[in-house]
Regions:
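Alpha-helical scaffold domains
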Residues: 134-136, 140-143, 147-150, 154-158, ...
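Generic structural signal for short, solvent-exposed loop/turn connectors between secondary structure elements
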Residues: 1, 74, 149-152, 193-194
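Alpha-helical oligomerization segments
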Residues: 156, 160-194
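Generic, low-specificity signal for short hydrophobic/alpha-helical stretches with a mild N-terminal bias
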Residues: 5, 9, 120, 124, ...
């Protein structure tokens, strides 16, 4: 699936009941209901490790797991995906599946997602000399983030997050400026945007 090596396939179902039992505290209250409303089932499809693909492990990363999450709705809550990433305590590449579309998600300082695509449009390549560099490459493949010279991957993710935040603030200010009736306030808002 998605051009990952056959030797890495494990196809192990992950039952929600076990997750509810093991992480009862984290899934207390309405979190469990929201989790259940979004997620139908989960399957660990691949384990990318030194044993399965003959790529050297690092101190931080001994394996990368690929988790396929069958969704009940395309409008899922990102918090559920973040929670899955944090609960497992492993490096996870998450494949979200709804009807015939797929979306890749990965958590590296924050949740990064690709656009929804057909299965044949997605090709995951194992690029790197060790699992650390393979993980970094997965992050860039999923997010589309291009690491600029002099930045680490985490620094570049933070730069991209700041760009998104500023673009949202500009869009909000432009909307307020268009709605503003008083010309002086409108002029001041336009000046702030520029």
């Amino acid at each position: 699936m998605f051009d990952l090596p056959k030797t890495s396939e494990i196809r192990k179902p992950l039952h929600k009941k076990l997750i509810y039992e093991k992480y009862a505290v984290e899934l207390s209250g309405n979190k469990k209901d929201k989790f259940d409303a979004d997620i139908s089932r989960m399957i660990i499809t691949n384990e990318i490790s030194e044993a399965s693909v003959n790529i050297k492990a690092t101190e931080e990363i001994s394996a990368i797991f690929v988790l396929q999450v069958e969704l009940k709705t395309k409008e899922y809550d990102d918090k559920n995906i973040v929670m899955i990433s944090k609960l497992f305590g492993q490096k996870l590449l998450i494949i979200l599946h709804y009807e015939n579309k797929y979306q890749l998600a990965i958590y590296e300082t924050r949740l990064l997602k690709s656009d929804w695509k057909d299965e044949e449009e997605i090709s995951l390549k194992l690029n790197g000399l060790d699992l650390g560099s393979v993980w970094d490459d997965f992050v860039t493949q999923v997010s589309g983030i291009d690491v600029q010279d002099g930045n680490t991957l985490v620094e570049q993710i933070n730069v991209e997050a700041e760009k998104e935040k500023l673009q949202k603030q500009i869009a909000d200010l432009e909307l307020k400026a268009r709605k503003e009736v008083q010309s002086k306030k409108k002029f001041e808002m336009v000046q702030r945007i520029q």
